[in-house]
Structures are given as structure tokens and as C-alpha cells.
């Protein structure tokens, strides 16, 4: 251990610790309005909307993640449900403009509200809600808090409600939409402790959700060391294209993962150096990772929080 008992260099984070790990880094906060939304077909039967690089506002309904759907011969799978009841309702309406096939599955990729609070909009379809085996506990711990924050920003009528997975993936799982198989992987602690990725067998496209950020700075709410391991796991899957959780609708996997791991490695290495040099966290949040500033949108909003999370993880290595 690098710190003596009863002594800590990150006293400014004590308030955060009292929340028992609640994700303050991904809670909606006020920001700029959303850009115009549209769905584009990025592969045969795969429709994706790009979310703006912004925070939740009353104007954008927390519609800030990349969401969409996949059409099989028999049914439709929702890749991400959206950031609010209003966002999910928008997506459901867009699906119905394109197909009358039943919506059989809705994927809940992780606990953060911009990815799962649209799920209630699909209730009347009675879909299977697919999620990581640890998602239920994460929603129990945070769901009502997130709902309350969304209600403050959007209003209770647009915020949505907590929806739990009905298919919990422990390791891997498959879903058949009729001539179209989706393969799921439950990951170890990384972006969160309940990250689920998916791959479309027909196109080979990977859906890593927030295990992959492009342009928008990654937000750390799980394990920094674990995220680097899971990034290697994503590489090993062999996909050449992916739909990231944030960023362009479709990206080349290799360079996108290179950018992600460069930032995470910088965060890890510079945090370790700060800890070894007894740098207080108040100073570390101002210096660690600054070489990455011009490479990421929302850097000033999230990098300091990432440094705080990294300190909490790495201080006791």
C-alpha cells in the first residue's frame, strides 16, 4: 500500500466516496442543445442515430448516446434504448416508420442513464430486455437516483423509469432475430461494472457500447486497469468496424481502440507517477492527462473526474 492508514492524498473526494460509487461522471448536467437527429443505415438492416457530444438538457431529452435497431427476418432488436422515456419513444416511432415486425429484444448495455432510460418506451412490445448479470444490482444502487436527476432536468413525464434485464448475460449469449444472430459478451469491470457488448454475425459489426468512446472523452466508472484489459478483449474479437457508444455511427475498430487505450494508458501511468511522488489529488486533477486535452470533446468536464477515479483505484495497488 502506498498510503498510511488514516491518511489520504485525495481528501477532496471524500464526499464522492459517501455516495458508494454513484456515477457522478455520467449524470446529466446542463449543456448545449442536441443537434438534429436522424437514423442512418450503417449496414444491411442496421440503423443508428448519432448522439451529439453534449450533456443532457431539457431540449435534447438526454438523447446523447448512439442508439438504433437491427432488423431480422422475424423481429427487431433495439441496440440501445436511449437516454429517457422521450428518447425511447422517439426511437420506437422511427422503428415503426420502417418496419411492422415485432420488437423482440431491447439491449441495456450498462447502467448509465443515457443508455438505458429509454427502455420503458418499449413496455407495450413486451420485449426481452438483455443486460449484464451485474446490471440489476447496479440499477438497484443507482436507478432511482438517476431517475430523480433526469426528472429534475427533463420533467418526470419525459424522464422514464428503471427497467431491469429479463435476460441476464453471465458470460455469453445469442439471440436469433430470424436469419440474424446477435452474440453478446459480458465484460469485467471497465467503463462500469456491468458492460455488455454485442456483435452482429451477419455483418461482423461490433457494438461495444461505452467500452468504446470516439471523439468524446471516455468516462471512468468501473476499473481503469480492467478497461485496458477489456479493450484488448475487444481487439481479439477480430471485428473491423464498430458502432461506439459515443462518436461517429460507424468507425474502424483498430484506430478507435488505439485512441482509447492511449488515453487510458496515459491516465494510468501519470496517475501512478503522481501517487508515487506524493502529489495531492488536488494538483493531480490539474496535471494528469493534460497532453490529451486537444484530442477529446468535453475534456475539461470529465478528465478531472477520471483522475479522481483512477486515484481511488491505483492508490492501494
Can you name each region flagged by the protein language model?
Residues 168-200:
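Core dinuclear metal-dependent hydrolase active-site scaffold
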Residues 16, 29-50:
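C-terminal segment of N-terminal export signals and the immediately downstream linker at the start
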Residues 276-317:
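C-terminal regulatory/interaction regions
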Residues 93-168, 174, 193, 269:
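Active-site HxH/HxHxD metal-binding segment of metal-dependent hydrolases
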Residues 2-25:
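N-terminal secretory signal peptides and thylakoid transit peptides that target proteins
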Residues 41-94, 196-208:
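Conserved beta-strand hairpin/beta-sheet module of binuclear metal-dependent hydrolase folds
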Residues 79-81, 105-110, 130-132, 207-209, ...:
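Active-site neighborhood of phospho(di)ester-bond hydrolases with catalytic His/Asp-centered motifs
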Residues 228-279, 287:
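Divalent-metal (often Zn2+) His-rich catalytic cores of metallo-beta-lactamase-fold enzymes
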Amino acid at each position: 500500500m502506498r498510503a498510511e492508514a488514516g491518511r489520504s492524498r485525495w481528501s477532496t473526494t471524500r464526499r464522492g466516496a459517501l455516495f458508494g460509487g454513484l456515477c457522478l461522471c455520467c449524470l446529466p448536467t446542463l449543456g448545449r442543445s442536441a443537434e438534429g437527429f436522424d437514423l442512418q443505415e450503417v449496414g444491411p438492416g442496421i440503423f443508428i442515430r448519432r448522439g451529439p457530444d453534449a450533456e443532457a438538457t431539457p431540449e435534447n431529452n438526454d438523447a446523447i448516446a448512439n442508439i438504433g435497431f437491427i432488423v431480422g427476418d422475424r423481429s427487431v432488436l433495439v441496440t440501445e434504448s436511449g437516454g429517457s422515456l422521450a428518447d425511447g419513444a422517439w426511437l420506437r416511432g422511427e422503428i415503426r416508420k420502417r418496419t411492422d415486425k415485432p420488437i423482440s429484444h431491447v439491449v441495456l448495455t450498462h447502467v448509465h442513464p443515457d443508455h438505458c432510460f429509454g427502455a420503458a418506451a418499449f413496455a407495450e412490445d413486451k420485449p426481452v430486455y438483455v443486460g449484464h448479470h451485474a446490471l440489476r444490482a447496479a440499477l438497484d444502487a443507482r436507478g432511482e437516483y438517476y431517475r430523480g436527476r433526469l426528472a429534475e432536468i427533463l420533467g418526470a413525464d419525459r424522464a422514464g423509469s428503471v427497467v431491469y434485464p429479463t435476460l441476464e448475460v453471465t458470460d455469453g449469449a445469442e439471440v436469433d432475430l430470424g436469419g440474424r444472430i446477435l452474440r453478446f459478451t459480458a465484460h469485467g469491470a471497465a467503463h462500469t461494472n456491468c458492460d455488455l457488448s454485442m456483435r452482429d454475425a451477419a455483418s461482423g459489426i461490433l457494438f461495444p457500447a461505452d467500452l468504446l468512446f470516439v471523439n468524446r472523452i471516455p468516462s471512468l466508472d468501473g476499473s481503469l486497469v480492467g478497461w485496458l484489459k477489456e479493450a484488448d478483449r475487444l481487439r481479439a474479437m477480430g471485428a473491423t468496424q464498430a458502432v461506439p457508444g459515443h462518436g461517429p455511427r460507424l468507425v474502424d475498430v483498430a484506430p478507435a481502440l488505439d485512441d482509447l487505450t492511449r488515453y487510458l494508458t496515459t491516465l494510468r501511468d501519470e496517475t501512478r507517477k503522481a501517487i508515487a511522488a506524493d502529489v495531492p489529488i488536488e494538483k493531480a486533477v490539474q496535471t494528469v492527462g493534460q497532453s490529451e486535452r486537444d484530442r477529446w470533446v468535453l475534456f475539461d468536464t470529465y478528465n478531472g473526474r477520471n483522475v479522481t477515479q483512477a486515484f481511488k483505484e491505483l492508490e492501494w495497488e
